A protein has these predicted regions:
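Fungal secretory targeting signals
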Residues: 1-23, 28
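Short stretches within intrinsically disordered, low-complexity N-terminal or propeptide regions
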Residues: 12-14, 32, 223
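Beta-strand-rich luminal/extracellular ectodomains of secretory-pathway glycoproteins
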Residues: 27-36
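Extracellular beta-rich repeat passengers
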Residues: 35-59, 66, 71-86, 114-269
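LRR N-terminal entry segment and analogous cap-like coil->beta motifs
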Residues: 64-78, 87-91, 95-112
């Protein structure tokens, strides 16, 4: 163990005393995550990390609390297991109701990214390489809203932002590249809810669909200021089910009473 030595001079007595103090906490300088997605492609959007930390267990942000990561890259030091769904203990961060997380990069070595147990707020949170999901709302009341402002995600085989609770998920000024679905309302949870998505200022590249919603449960997705390149569908509707053994069935795509946007809301780059 390293120690800092403090020398206290007692000139009147002609003596010196040595006191051992524990070292300050250290954050390992991160290997470069900048400009790297999980598939090896490059992007100028992922910010440089200020360090890295592999957590031995999920870091919980208490109800109403906040955590500012200072752009450190956090993960769990484990390999991604693909689309095999993990649980809360596999997440990097778990945010209790009313909590907030800001200025964090979720590194590539994890199974689950961030779990939200009630309305929460994410500001400038980035995912270097998505595993099963980048972010999941596990619980939320019908009248509540979770807010994601800024940040981005890269290299998602399927979903980026998953909504399993009720109420609204609002996402603004978010970048996503190489993905399956940016947002998805759970299609076959044991308990199904009406869910709403508000997407504004999204820049999306190389993906299947921006939003997947269940119109038979009253879901809606509203889009404004969207810029896309290589994205197949803006909004896809499904017939959801509360039978976890069944898969939801796609039943439509494009503007509708459920998928709310016009051609002026979407710009192709």
């Amino acid at each position: 163990m390293k120690y800092s030595l403090v020398i206290v001079s007692a000139l009147a007595m002609g003596t010196s005393a040595l006191y051992a103090l524990p070292p300050p906490p250290q954050i390992t300088a991160a290997p470069s995550l900048k400009n790297r997605a999980s598939n090896g492609t490059t992007s100028g959007s992922l910010p440089a990390s200020s360090g890295s930390s592999a957590l031995s267990e999920v870091k919980t942000i208490a109800a109403g609390g906040s955590f500012d990561g200072g752009m450190v890259s956090y993960d769990r030091g484990v390999s991604c297991t693909g689309q095999a769904e993990g649980d809360d203990s596999d997440a990097v961060f778990e945010i209790e109701e009313g909590g907030s997380l800001s200025n964090v990069i979720i590194g590539p070595n994890q199974i689950e990214g961030v779990h939200c147990q009630g309305a929460c707020t994410l500001t400038n949170v980035w995912w270097a390489a998505v595993c099963e999901d980048a972010f999941s709302i596990k619980n939320q009341a019908a009248g509540d809203t979770t807010i994601i402002s800024g940040g981005g995600a890269f290299g998602a085989e399927d979903k980026v932002l998953q909504h399993n609770g009720a109420g609204t998920l609002s996402v603004s000024d978010f970048t996503v590249e190489t993905f399956g679905k940016l947002v998805r309302s759970c299609g076959n949870c044991d308990t199904m809810y009406e869910r709403h998505f508000i997407l504004d200022g999204i820049t999306a590249t190389d993906g299947s669909e921006l939003a997947g919603i269940n119109d038979n449960y009253g879901d809606t997705a509203t889009f404004t200021n969207i810029v896309v390149s290589g994205v197949d569908d803006i909004c896809v509707t499904y017939t959801g089910t509360d039978n976890n053994d069944e898969e939801p069935v796609e039943n439509g795509s494009g503007p509708s009473d459920s998928c709310i946007y016009s051609t002026s809301d979407i710009t192709s780059s």
